Design a protein with these regions (language model features):
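Nucleotidyltransferase catalytic core that binds NTPs
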Residues: 2-114
Length: 114
């Protein structure tokens, strides 16, 4: 019975700051695993550690343009959100995935400088 209930509880995907704040507000003990996508064994290890040590765990997927020397490299960065989500949804007890847009991360910033 517990197994069936655990399968029915799925991770929630959050797409903006407003929903992120509203969703996380009730929780005090939250583990956070930031990524630029390309979910791999290292990420999965960090996520599992967070799940063990925190009441709730959130993974972010955000390709940060500030981490690239030029816009061309940023535009060529291989992003595959569907693949990342298919990997993440297999991780039991992962609560949330946050996939912000540029303006959610860099609010009030007129220009990004490297």
């Amino acid at each position: 019975m517990f197994y069936l209930l655990n399968i029915l509880i799925q991770m929630k995907i959050i797409l903006n700051n407003r929903d992120l704040s509203k969703t996380l507000r009730p929780f005090k003990d939250i583990g956070f695993v930031p990524t630029m996508g390309g979910i791999h064994k290292g990420h999965i290890s960090l996520i599992r550690r967070s799940i063990k040590t925190s009441k709730k765990t959130i993974v972010s997927i955000f390709i940060n343009p500030k981490q690239f020397n030029n816009i061309r490299d940023f535009n060529l960065y291989p992003a595959n959100i569907k693949k990342d989500l298919s990997i993440l949804k297999k991780i039991r007890r992962l609560d949330f995935v946050y996939i912000p847009k540029f303006m959610d991360v860099y609010q009030n910033k007129k220009k990004i400088r490297n």
